[in-house]
Amino acid sequence: MKPSERRKARRLAVQAIYSWQLSGNNIADVEHEFLTEQSLDGVDVAYFRELFSGVATKKTQLDELIIPHLERPIDEVSPVEKAIVRLATYELTFRKDVPYKVAINEAIELAKAFGADESHKFVNGLLDKLVARK
């Protein structure tokens, strides 16, 4: 499996998580929308599905891991940063085949692509704290 296929799956998953967080729509509906309306060229679709459904169904558990490392309420974290951190926390917690450095670096790249100017620093710092605690 090419790393670029997983990278594309992560990019699509972050967008789906973001959309789901804001819309509150049914998980299956959001997944269907992304699988039918987005280009899936070079995307590891199975990995996209796992990441998106995993984050959506384990949101409470993921947030319980994230919240102790925040310096503000989770509701004050931008939706983009929240989507990225939840995705990375899912990978760090449930995908032991993904090295923690890969999960963190991918999250930083997602924050650079989708977040505000300083998002990547926030994401990096938070995930470093999360990994140090494990």
UniProtKB/Swiss-Prot annotation:
Keywords: RNA-binding, Transcription, Transcription antitermination, Transcription regulation. HAMAP family: NusB. GO terms for biological process: DNA-templated transcription termination; transcription antitermination. Involved in transcription antitermination. Required for transcription of ribosomal RNA (rRNA) genes. Binds specifically to the boxA antiterminator sequence of the ribosomal RNA (rrn) operons. One of its GO terms (molecular function) is RNA binding. CDD domains: Terminator_NusB. The keyword Transcription applies. Belongs to the NusB family. The keyword RNA-binding applies. It comes from the Bacteria. GO terms for cellular component: cytosol. The gene is nusB. This is Transcription antitermination protein NusB.
